[in-house]
Amino acid sequence: MRTEYCGQLRLSHVGQQVTLCGWVNRRRDLGSLIFIDMRDREGIVQVFFDPDRADALKLASELRNEFCIQVTGTVRARDEKNINRDMATGEIEVLASSLTIINRADVLPLDSNHVNTEEARLKYRYLDLRRPEMAQRLKTRAKITSLVRRFMDDHGFLDIETPMLTKATPEGARDYLVPSRVHKGKFYALPQSPQLFKQLLMMSGFDRYYQIVKCFRDEDLRADRQPEFTQIDVETSFMTAPQVREVMEALVRHLWLEVKGVDLGDFPVMTFAEAERRYGSDKPDLRNPMELTDVADLLKSVEFAVFAGPANDPKGRVAALRVPGGASLTRKQIDEYGNFVKIYGAKGLAYIKVNERAKGLEGINSPVAKFLNAEIIEDILDRTAAQDGDMIFFGADNKKIVADAMGALRLKVGKDLGLTDESKWAPLWVIDFPMFEDDGEGGLTAMHHPFTSPKDMTAAELKAAPENAVANAYDMVINGYEVGGGSVRIHNGDMQQTVFGILGINEEEQREKFGFLLDALKYGTPPHAGLAFGLDRLTMLLTGTDNIRDVIAFPKTTAAACLMTEAPSFANPTALAELSIQVVKKAENN
């Protein structure tokens, strides 16, 4: 039906007759001439109709936005004064000789001249996806997956599919369950990841596996989460953690070079402990120059319980955040930041405004200065490298609250004051995570998943001191986003059962849920390690959007609903009966 794409016409096509198919993006009626911007997935070109082709001109007068049309015409160079430098096709136009209206469009529910609500965009997603910026994001996503496949193929990885209908296993979030019609009362689970299957593939001798795969998690959503999402899933045998990181880093550098024309360079490597200490986060945004500075040792003897309490508590922390130029902040802004850190459990926000260091106590402004002597204040200013015009904020509480609150404050202040360099890319690896964390009920939970191997520990050593265990795990972080994470896996049955035991999974439950894995570990399992990238999040970064729904063709809302198809919906009673399922309404409380 067509010979060329609208957006691919250039000066080299001048004089050629072309046939185009697409949509009316805009129409301008000048009476004797009608101009339209005609759009397809590759872009927009200007088409005009003149009186010499009366039939085409007459039909063009009926055109409205989003009519689907076919145009045949001749490509012409525009006059110098009419060249549009903002369009890729701005040096040419098409003089139409014939026009076919393939399909007309009703009054549009989306307005291309205004910002539409996200609700409207999701309800009429097929119209939203016609917008050039949305089409470009999905084209970039397609390019990314193509680049990934070629890279992985070139590095000896095999693309192997794993099951979608599988067994529910604890991986940190709720499963989406699928009832079995054949096996009454039993359910499949949609996979949260192919974790165990890819490990089993390593046990099967496949050495290097990858898959671009859908995963499902029934969890509370936010801007960068979806109930169904896509992973670039990778597993290897006989490779160490640094070797896995080297290959995966090369993949991501390749993507940035091909998509953005940017060489990310070598990724720095930072331990979890260092990231938490310096940035208050295990996914630090290194574009932000500010760091947390520990000052507890300077405040142990002060007569100010807010500082002295955490300073003398082994589980406490007092950290300072120097904000360059922050002395210009108003009292209202400071109060707003004080309220902001309360979201993360902090009780408030102490501060020192550094107006003129040379004047000592007279050169600062602080509500806590009366509790601190001149020597302590000078030591704090020295340690934080404070200069005239700076602000120092303090967090004092248990270690987690201080890290969470001050880490979040660092990001917010960096953005508010323009201290974060938005033009940069700042990748890094974070390694050496704690193996376990407190589950809040006196037990332990796996910080990553229960198949992660500890670093340099035997099963006996792990059982004796699980709280000291360091996971042989690694996360890739870019600009404050965790884009991928992985680990060396447990390849020994005794170690795997030890980890299960630490997590409170008794032997009977181990057999019930993981018997197939424990059996497989008996038969010469190779050492193996892997990683998974979030394709949606990678695409989000590479296309410059801050909303993951912008890079998924048909995403769900934050309520896990599809506004277009109205999914989820009530099931047919007959279908439920075949599955032996009965929907029971909860009794309402009076």
Curated annotation (Swiss-Prot):
Q: Name the enzyme's class.
A: ligase
Biological process (GO), any one: aspartyl-tRNA aminoacylation
Read off the PROSITE patterns from this record.
Answer: AA_TRNA_LIGASE_II
Q: Which CDD domains match?
A: AspRS_core, EcAspRS_like_N
Keywords on this record?
Aminoacyl-tRNA synthetase, ATP-binding, Cytoplasm, Ligase, Nucleotide-binding, Protein biosynthesis
UniProt region (Aspartate), positions on chain? 195-198
| Gene3D superfamilies for this protein | Bira Bifunctional Protein, Domain 2, GAD-like domain, Nucleic acid-binding proteins
Q: Does the keyword ATP-binding apply?
A: yes
What's a Gene Ontology MF term here?
nucleic acid binding
Pfam family membership, one: tRNA_anti-codon
One GO cellular component, as annotated: cytosol
Domain of life, source organism: Bacteria
- What EC identifiers does the entry list? 6.1.1.12
Record's subcellular location: Cytoplasm
InterPro entries found in the cross-reference section: Aa-tRNA-synt_II, aa-tRNA-synth_II, aa-tRNA-synth_II/BPL/LPL, Asp-tRNA-ligase_1, Asp-tRNA-ligase_1_N, Asp/Asn-tRNA-synth_IIb, AspRS_core, GAD-like_sf
* Chain residues that bind ATP: 217-219, 226, 482, 534-537
Q: Which residues bind L-aspartate?
A: 171, 217, 448, 489
What's the subunit arrangement here? Homodimer.
Q: What is this protein's function?
A: Catalyzes the attachment of L-aspartate to tRNA(Asp) in a two-step reaction: L-aspartate is first activated by ATP to form Asp-AMP and then transferred to the acceptor end of tRNA(Asp). Also mischarges tRNA(Asp) with D-aspartate, although it is a poor substrate.
Family assignment from sequence similarity: Belongs to the class-II aminoacyl-tRNA synthetase family. Type 1 subfamily.
Entry protein name: Aspartate--tRNA ligase
The organism's lineage? Bacteria, Pseudomonadati, Pseudomonadota, Gammaproteobacteria, Enterobacterales
UniProt gene name: aspS
